[in-house]
Amino acid sequence: MRNSAVFNRYSIISGALFFITLLTAHSVSSAENVNRYRSHYKAALLADAESGRILHHDRMHQKIYPASLVKMMVALIALEELESGRISLQDSVKVSRWASKIGGHQVYLKQGEIFKFRELMEATVIASANDASVAVAEHVLGSDKVFIKRMNERALELGMNKTRFYSVHGLPPGRGQQLDVSSAYDLYLLALELIKHPQFLRWSSTRLESFRNGTFQLLNTNHRLIKSYRGMEGMKTGYHRRAGFNLVSSAKRDGQRYISIIIGAKNSRMRSKTTRHLLDYGFNNYQKFELNKIDADVSYSAGVKGGELENVPLRATEAVNLLLSAEEHRRLEIWPQIPVQTGAPVKAEQKLGTLEFWLDGKLLKEVALQTEFAVLEQSVLSELTSMLTNLSGTN
């Protein structure tokens, strides 16, 4: 609630409250420019990677076929197992007969060959190798069937409610098998989790890597954008005939990172073009507004009953950085939720109320307010002195 009997309610435009460092906003790429290509893809999404705020979306909950984007989940589970210490990048992995038989995009693993686990992860993430992805799954959990079960469990943990994995590679299914299914929104949730692992971004942004002691080169399936789009960190491509051309990507400039998702593009060129437009829309129209503590000209305080002071000043417990367009910044409202009065004694840095940041009726952020110093309970002598002062003031 934004109002109650014990809280003061204010609607204050943020520019009057905070010192803001603002660069000129450009509108080179508008939402309309992004939407003009919507007939060329099945779903799209753009999000701020830090806050998770979705800035643009189109059919984001529609069922789609991820194709090789399933390898994002393979990578996530493998990285989580690596970080737990249960496996190591230096582990030796013997290629199974099953892994060697997987077709499609591959690095031509042969049964009985031995690779470092790191090499197989690189082949999976950089080159989207289906055979390497199976070998990774088998090493991590013993078999791809057990691994697929874990993929679906992890998807549910992340809230990927429209996702169902049936493979570790994303290839079109054989007779009697089912297609992997997901949604742009679910893949956004997966991408948010993946970027918490710097090693994944190091691999996915690698354009070219040697394999088999330099006799084979792993070319990133997103190599064109990695080379030509400033800040592109890669992530993962996917394609088969029914899926269309898919790309989940992340790009970072000047500390600002966006996640872009294009699903079902008609060809790789259109996939790259719409990805550029999405990312341009983010970089050109949004920026981080630094709402740095509370401005010196504006102060909040709470009344203190029975204290040596009648009021105690309050400060925000943290700086607030919000990604906004210039127009959104003008509409931003800040609502202090402060108790009318609190009883003494009051501790230093005691939490008393909150600041709420609202945009178009939606709560974007809430931070606690705390006292700047302690207020002791009023002593008998102080209370008597105060009473005498008040009495003398009435004569």
What would you call each of these model-derived segments?
Residues S30-L189, L194-P198:
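Active-site-adjacent loops and short helices of periplasmic peptidoglycan-processing enzymes
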Residues A25-N33, Q370:
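Bacterial Sec-dependent signal peptides at the C-terminal "C-region" and cleavage site
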Residues S14-T24:
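Bacterial N-terminal signal peptides
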Residues I20-T21, V34, E83-G85, R241, ...:
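Generic marker of residues within folded, mature protein domains
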Residues M160, R175-N395:
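Domain-terminus/edge residues, biased toward the C-terminal soluble/receptor-binding domains
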Residues S29, R150-M151, T221, L278:
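Generic structural signal for hydrophobic residues
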Residues R2-G15:
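Bacterial N-terminal signal peptides that target proteins for export
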